A protein has these predicted regions:
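Bacterial N-terminal signal peptides that target proteins for export
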Residues: 1-11
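Bacterial N-terminal signal peptides
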Residues: 9-22
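Blade/loop signatures of beta-propeller domains
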Residues: 27-86
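Extracytoplasmic mature domains of secreted/periplasmic and thylakoid-lumen proteins
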Residues: 209-210
Length: 536
């Protein structure tokens, strides 16, 4: 079955199996590779400055609380996108998967599947610090200011003698999750550990979606590799349940945790190998939660059941109370045949229409895109079929400006590909397609074998241009007016890197482009690429 998938899908599937077996103690954990990595060579000169959260940034997965993936102030004109050239390349040590870059206050933060977390200068690419986590990570980092100093940050001898606590500033923190279900908080300036919390003890739990941050709380979702482990007939499937939790940002203390499968797993039957099976289970949450400040709500999109036992929160968009985590409403969007392609792997997007009404936008693996009403229990306002079949629908997520939703479609994963990937602009109010641009014929530097033009990567949009990556390694910019391709760069090549690491690009998947201060950042292979107008 793996032969029918595009190259990065094969890598992803193998990574799932690798991680699952590692958790079961059969092979080494990939995070162990981080301990053998050497220090970076291109260290920044001089002392590091404190990191302040500002307006010109891309913080976390979707850039804003609503997960729009829209950069309103890119410092690049759409007319100049065609002039983008490579500014620099940075090579990652170990691993082949990386979190989407976060850029805040002139600093770039990124995680890696080898466990190393990097803080770079966003303009020059020099290294401020690295931190080696115990397990691999592929979430985006989110930066938060911890505010005025808490008691935990004061020297003990000053607890009762300091007259004005507000003169002491606690550090900004870099938050991320890893493949063991652990959440980390690092000092964003120095890279030292502030705290870490094991959020889920299931051996196959992992955090894929980046945390969301609001009002001194960190909201974290949980996914797993159990679907891959279930391919092993000797594995007792399945007991993992997706969840969302709120943590105190200063201490990492869990304030509440709500499961997407409400019932605890129970013994169900024995499989053909005589192994006891369990259920209900599943509903992994693989994408960053969306914050609705107006309604004090948190929106998450869930995956499918892993046992076939029906549950109301599988294949759904659900709203939870920000304060206590209680379920507000759920809109289940399963296919009638219960196929796994009904699940979601991308974040809901909250957008305000010209009328002042708001809509929740969500794309399904089946290729169906929905507009939901946040004021009436997720009632379907419209739905649109963005893909011709369920073979390859919406993967890591659309982006939305003030007018359109830009949806990338994987098309067919079969080899040879018989259906193209595409980028489609849908009217946010009606779901009607304004334009659709099919992916160009796949052009892979490694040849025709396992070459796909599927567009699974998350989309990024700025005024006038939308960026979408393809599994053939090409990053393209499209006109938001008519879908015309404005710029095309093949990332699947060998690059000379700032830090001397041998690096090359490859298929583009998962995290999309990050745009800040006139620079477009993208991960490809084991390379971080930075583009600017004329490469300057």
């Amino acid at each position: 079955m793996l032969r029918a998938h595009a190259p990065l899908r094969i890598a992803a599937a193998l990574y799932l199996v690798f991680s699952a077996n590692a958790a079961l103690g059969q092979i080494p954990d990939p995070g162990e590779a981080a301990m053998a990595m050497v220090p970076e060579k291109n260290l920044c000169a001089g002392p590091t400055a404190p990191v302040a959260v500002g307006a010109a940034q891309w913080n976390g997965w979707g850039r804003d609380l609503e997960n729009t993936r829209y950069q309103p102030e890119p410092a690049i004109r759409a007319a100049d996108v065609a002039k983008l050239g490579l500014k620099w390349a940075f090579g990652y040590q170990g691993g082949t998967e990386y979190g989407q870059p976060t850029v805040v206050d002139g600093r770039l933060f990124v995680t890696s599947s080898a466990g190393r977390v990097y803080s770079l200068d966003s303009k020059t690419g020099c290294t401020y610090w690295t931190y080696d986590a115990a397990s691999g990570s592929r979430t985006a980092v989110i930066i938060g200011e911890l505010g005025q100093a808490k008691k935990a940050y004061l020297p003990k001898k000053l607890k009762h003698t300091l007259a004005h606590l507000d003169i002491i500033k606690a550090p900004s923190a870099a938050f991320f999750g890893d493949d063991s279900g652990t959440v980390y908080a690092l000092d964003a300036q120095k890279g030292t550990l502030l705290w870490k919390t094991q959020l889920d003890t299931h051996p196959l739990a992992r955090i894929v979606g980046a945390p969301a941050l609001y009002n001194e709380r960190l909201y974290v979702v949980m996914s797993s590799t159990e679907e891959a482990a279930a391919l092993n007939p000797n594995y007792s499937c399945c007991t993992f349940r997706g969840s969302v939790a709120a943590l105190d940002i200063a201490s990492g203390r869990v304030l509440w945790k709500t499961y997407a499968v409400l019932e605890e797993p129970r013994p169900t039957r024995q499989n053909g190998s005589g192994i006891q099976e369990f259920g209900p289970a599943g509903a992994p949450v693989s994408s960053t939660p969306t914050i609705d400040v107006k309604r004090s709500a948190l929106y998450v999109a869930t995956g499918s059941s892993s046992t076939g036992i029906g549950q109301s929160l599988t294949d759904a968009v659900a709203a939870f109370d920000l304060g206590d985590g209680k379920l507000r409403w759920v809109k289940q969007l399963s296919r009638p045949d219960g196929a796994a392609s009904s699940g979601f792997t991308n974040s809901p997007i909250l957008r305000t229409l010209a009328s002042g009404n708001q809509v929740i936008l969500a794309g399904q693996k089946s290729g169906v895109v929905y507009g939901l009403d946040p004021d009436h229990g997720g009632e379907i306002l419209w739905q649109a079929k963005a893909a011709e079949s369920a073979a390859g629908g919406v993967a890591w997520g659309p982006a939305a400006d003030h007018r359109n939703l830009y949806v990338a479609i994987s098309g067919s994963m079969a080899q040879p590909a018989n259906k193209q990937g595409s980028l489609t602009a849908l009217d946010m109010k009606t779901g009607i397609a304004r334009w659709q641009t099919p992916a160009p014929a796949p052009a892979c530097t490694w040849g025709d074998r396992s070459c796909s033009h599927a567009q699974a990567q998350a989309v990024t949009v700025m005024p006038g241009s939308a960026f979408s990556g393809s599994l053939d390694g090409h990053l393209r910019a499209y006109s938001t007016i008519d879908g015309k391709i404005l710029w095309d760069f093949d990332t699947a090549k060998v690059f000379q890197t700032l830090n001397g690491v041998k690096a090359s690009g490859g298929p583009l998947d998962h995290g999309g482009a990050t745009i800040v201060n006139g620079i477009v950042y993208i991960n490809s292979g084991n390379t971080l690429l930075a583009f600017s107008v004329d490469g300057k």
